[in-house]
Amino acid sequence: MLLPAGRMPAPARSFILALALTGAAAPPAGAQAAQQAPAAQQAPAAQQDSAAPPAAPTPSETRIGLIYRVQPQPSSYDAEAAPEDEGVAGARMGIADNNTTGRFTKQSYALDEAPLTEGGPGAVETARALVAKGTPYIVLALPADEVLAVADALKDTDAVIFNAAAPDDRLRGADCRKNLFHVVPSRAMQTDALAQYLTLMRWRKLFLIVGPNEADRLYAEALKNSARKFGLKISAEKPWTFGPLAKARGDTPTRAEAMVFTRGLDYDMAIVADEAGDWGDYVPYRTVDPRPVGGTQGLVATTWSPVLETWGAAQAQNRFRRLAGRLMRPLDYQVWTSVRIVGNAATVRKTTDPAALAPFLIDPDFNVPAYKGVSLSFRPWDRQLRQPLIVVQPKMLVSVAPEQGFLHQRTPLDTLGIDLPETACKLK
């Protein structure tokens, strides 16, 4: 007997309602399978849509090594002491600049700093270790003998070596090497730059003062060659025998003797040959007759100075100061240029393979901008970097060599240093 809905017992109403809901929620088995099939087909597509896009190609990393000798810090105050990161800071800025341009060419650069310490591995052992671990470009801030030893040790590899510190003319002459590129100017370039300015000023009679070290003798020899080249005259030459007066901590009786040292001489300018900086700064303002002083101190020819601001150099000076917290020095600039040469050549050639870049460095199409007003390039006959040199005193840019009027059939830059007809280089 059917009961009216209103009179149906509560348990019965609950059972009927639950049965109705269960029937509505559970479709037949066929329909359930039909619903699951499209879902299974749609799952891969949904997963593909949510997957991350393919990663961009990873830039290839090129390693550039810097081998340098740690200089002992002075035991007492020395305003001119080389900073501990001299050269290294230039390399770091060069790597940063290479990576800035490398972002657009999928090239990446890293620096391997390899300081040489007392009792540690030598330059040759360090260079071989760098090449063995995949560092094909080596920048050397070392003396000439160590530079030559590294070049010879790596001659059977594809390594490209940059000399950033040794100015010795023999490395561009009898001891030149195919795998060795010179970014630091030779002594001949430095003395030619100074001689051009003296010729321009008609200061033709020179008093040459030579220090006791071998480097001083080599500088004096280069100066004599420049004097012959540009028609100057060494009217007097004397050795310096008064010790390191520029580093003395007070006046001494030697001062009177040094004053007499310059008496009775006929000259327009005194040229000091003191590459160690022991006494050259003592000479200015202490000559008997009022004469300018130049050479390794006083008026000098160099690659870089904090006083250089033209050709975008002020921007480089500011960037370096932010990076290193100090002023940029010539060695910093020379190491920076070495690193940038690699980056610039790789950008043009679209490869960082040293076997491809080494021949390109002496190609007429290669050049590198380096805040000098003109692009720099390598001389193919001795691997020396052509570059203008600035003639400066401590607080002012005086001139830039090559001077106007000194002409050359290829480029005025080849009026500085050893030209092709004069070279003794036979690349090995």
Role assignments for model-derived ranges:
Residues 25-28:
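N-terminal signal peptide c-region/cleavage motif recognized by signal peptidases
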Residues 8, 12-14:
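Twin-arginine (Tat) signal peptide motif
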